[in-house]
């Protein structure tokens, strides 16, 4: 069973469009875990799961919630372990910027406060072609901020998952990763 060599990120990755049925419901990490469980069920009931950055936090959270996985690969999960936490109202401030039509400013705020990028790096990103691709995904910054606020330190259930876990950490990377 499992996904084998089929790439699912292109079909099931993040969309720049909000899910209409969830547009007015508050984001909850458990819904993301349920979505992942549905994707795994659709491909045969088991899969090795790879998550990068906040996706790694979500993947481990989902495993702790019982989502069936054969292996878990976590690339640079941004656990803070109680240190250097962003402001508790970051998700609300991000959502307010997006709701007011300032998705670009939400991306910048997220890069500054959640990721911890210095202003010169943010300005380089903003001046690059990559920035235009990030702006339509601004809503995901809210979700990332909610998730990493809820799980800034792995829970006992996350630490006790019973599938093999491989954690990848890059050497030249952002300090929180």
Feature locations, PLM:
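Active-site loop/oxyanion-hole signature of alpha/beta-hydrolase fold enzymes
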Residues: 2-50
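Charged, alpha-helical scaffolding/interaction elements associated with membrane systems
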Residues: 6, 65, 99-100
């Amino acid at each position: 069973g499992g996904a084998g060599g089929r790439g699912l990120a292109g079909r099931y990755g993040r969309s720049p469009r909000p899910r209409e049925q969830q547009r007015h419901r508050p984001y909850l990490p458990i819904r993301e875990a349920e979505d992942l469980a549905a994707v795994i069920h659709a491909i045969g009931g088991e899969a090795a799961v790879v998550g990068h950055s906040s996706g790694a936090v979500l993947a481990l959270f989902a495993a702790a919630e019982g989502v069936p996985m054969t292996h878990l690969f976590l690339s640079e999960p941004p656990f803070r372990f109680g240190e250097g936490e962003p402001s508790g109202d970051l998700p609300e401030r991000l959502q307010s910027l997006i709701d007011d039509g300032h998705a670009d400013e939400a991306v910048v705020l997220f890069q500054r406060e959640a990721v911890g990028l210095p202003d010169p790096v943010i300005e380089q990103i903003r001046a690059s072609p990559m920035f235009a691709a990030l702006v339509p995904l601004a809503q995901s910054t809210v979700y990332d901020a909610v998730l990493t606020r809820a799980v800034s330190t792995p829970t006992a259930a996350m630490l006790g998952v019973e599938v093999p876990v491989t954690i990848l950490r890059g050497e030249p990377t952002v300090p929180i990763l």
